[in-house]
Amino acid sequence: MADEQFPAAATALEEYQSIEEQMASPEVVSNPDKLRKLGRRHAELGAIVGAYKAWLQVKDDLAAAQEMAGEDADFAEEAKRLEDELPGVEEKLRTALIPRDPDDARDTIMEIKAGTGGEEAALFAGDLLRMYTRYAEKRGWSVNVQSENTTELGGVKDVQIAIRAKGTPAPEDGVWASMKYEGGVHRVQRIPVTESQGRIQTSAAGVIVFPEADEDDDEIEIDPKDLKIDIFMSSGPGGQSVNTTYSAVRMTHLPTGITVNMQDEKSQIQNRAAALRVLKSRLLAMKHEQEAAEAADMRHSQVRSLDRSERIRTYNFPENRIVDHRTNYKAYNLDAVLDGDLQAVIDSDIQADEADRLANQK
């Protein structure tokens, strides 16, 4: 029987059908949080179910064609075609059954920090912010700036953004599925605008990414007693006050020392809620990173993407060249990449990760 050969796929189909029934119930329809969680799991199972149904169809058609092959030459020809098609369909199903990163469908919190290089590093951090914003626009995602410290020349000392998809995307289309590869040190080589002798300078910016926790995420629980909350006045570029109320929030998680600053919402209550969500996201990322390290499983590429010290990419302006050091991807369209044409670079990381996961399954 089919489910004896691929029991995991048969189980996925049963769960998929059960979720569809739940999502149609009035109780779930009236509960957005429950509906979102079920929708995410439904999308996660979709690739497996689609591949499984395709495999079942080919198997059934092949059996029927073989049964009639002795009586009709057309059926014999059809049976031969289906025999040739079956291995490819089966391989697609085996690939779909390889566990994905469970966070792929989640949205993403990203921090960009200017590194070595002074004002030039801050200007480059601003370039990265623009690049990711343009890329998100091309993908139909929204970008919300949660906190930002800028320089007098328009550079970015540090910025935190939330990148979010619309609705409930399939895991492969989720924000985290693509943006998790962006964590690390990004190096730039170019002639600074302040360089009078035309010398190329190397500077860097660090990017930190982690999947965004849901507001009601029960995977992470925070005891209010573990929080220290400071309230202060929001500030803009150069320390200028952007409002006259103390609405900015600094939230510190005492057990881990993680600190989150939030000032871009309109009220203290909104900044508290936003800070708590970012804190939960950080703790969720830490939890998953620890689990991956302990289990030494297929999520190693995600852990690598969270490594803040790894130089992952070089942006060479004089040669209009971009290099991803993890995959050896190289192209001479840096201007287009910085304008948001980033997909080919990210695809090289996705393909390398998929190859690793396939190798680890064998």
Swiss-Prot record:
Gene3D superfamilies: 3.30.160.20, 3.30.70.1660, 6.10.140.1950. Keywords: Cytoplasm, Methylation, Protein biosynthesis. The keyword Cytoplasm applies. It is found in: Cytoplasm. GO terms for molecular function: translation release factor activity, codon specific. GO terms for cellular component: cytoplasm. The modification N5-methylglutamine is found at residue 240. Coiled coil: none annotated. Pfam families: PCRF (PF03462), RF-1 (PF00472). Methylated by PrmC. Methylation increases the termination efficiency of RF1. The keyword Protein biosynthesis applies. NCBIfam families: prfA, PRK00591.1. Peptide chain release factor 1 directs the termination of translation in response to the peptide chain termination codons UAG and UAA. Belongs to the prokaryotic/mitochondrial release factor family. This is Peptide chain release factor 1. The lineage of its organism: Bacteria, Bacillati, Actinomycetota, Actinomycetes, Bifidobacteriales.
